[in-house]
Amino acid sequence: MKILKQSDFPTPPVAEIIPDTFTNFGQQRIDNYFWLKDKSNPKVIEYLKAENAYTDSVTASTKALQQVIFDEIVGRMKEDDESYPSFEDGYYYYSRTEKGKQYRTYCRRKGSMEAPEEVIFDVNAMAEGKPAFIFSGYSISPDNAKAVYFYNETGSYAEFKMKIKDLASGEDIGFSMDGVASAAWANDNKTLFYSLIDKTLRSSAIYRQTLDAPAGELIYKETDVRFSAYVSGSKTKQYIFITSASSTTSEERYISADRPTDRFKVFLPRVQDVEYSVYPHKEKFFVRYKDKENLNGLIYEMPLTGYEDRAAWKPFMPHDKNVRIEGIDILKDYVLLELRKNGLTEIQVKPVSGAGETETIAFPEPVYSAWLSGNPEYDAAAFRYSYTSLNRPTTLYEYNIGTKETKKLKEQEIPSGFNPGDYTVERLWATAPDGVQVPMAIVYKNGLKKNGGNPAL
């Protein structure tokens, strides 16, 4: 085997130093390479091409191996695939990939999966002829007639253009906007709230604009550079929220989605090192709350009015030093919880009333990843979650809360072949020098002789 030296390679390209000065938290910071973020700058493109050419030159001797690795990876991917449909507001939504095509196609069917297919976005057609294209997603209007969507043609995941599409004609309507980070529809189907990024790519300004208006109206500006601000709608379709958040502190404002011209009201005033998130139920608010004394979080239930009085707060799930609250989803009759316990996710189902039995979803392996997955319907009596482990591909399940039945909806297919039953997963605990128990996950093929002579990766 030949040992390569630096002299065997061509001289690598060197980026030009062009200092940019930024002031944050009272201190100046110099970034010599901030200019490389500007993908419209011909010098940036020239430099990227030089980097790519250098990489091609250095790795030229590995071309055959690269192809072998690529073919193996592709052999484990199902190129022509379709997501399991998700029902929302009378439509079944799904997406699919096709062999030889780079992007997804997003579709829906009205009422049933036997109804005619409506293609919402053919991203392959949208990206055709463009050197780079990223589709960031879409949001359907309450009347199901329009979609606001986000994309860019620069390859940057930080900056997106927003447009609005009429789903009947397939044409773009209304206004478009650059630098949008989030958006939410009001219930009048013509008013959009959206957030814009600033020159540091921080989402900080919230605007309101109707489809026929020439310009948006600034309704909130986050002036604290430690915070970013985003807008969202509630699952109940009742509210529009503005969330301001830093790494340790958050604050929310809201209005009725039926009254888009109202002034936003602060839910709870900003307090340093207090984070909270509001999850509306049609009869109350659920609030995930975290402060220095409750680092793992707790959940309160609060009335729709009068919650400003802390005496009106009722503990729904108390703080537990051994269990961290990682996610919440609200249904009409149940609260779904994602919890972190002993380093693993637990999914629990708790009645909205707080009374009655709390159910915990059982999983087959001792080590795994699981998460709530696509539950848009507020009135649903079942919910979906995804599961994967060291010996099991990602699988989508549906759990019926009333019947307590679990149904497998879709398992990731491995075209090259794979049988989870051929492997065993174990979880062991190692004792660190300070006495702390450290979990270890082990996967091995069935029939392994545990004689201490097996190599480990």
Features from the language model and the residues they span:
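Hydrophobic beta-strand anchors of alpha/beta hydrolase catalytic cores
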Residues: 455-457
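A conserved hydrophobic secondary-structure block that centers on an alpha-helix together
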Residues: 118-184, 188-189, 332, 337
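N-terminal pre-domain segments of enzymes
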Residues: 1-59, 63, 67-81
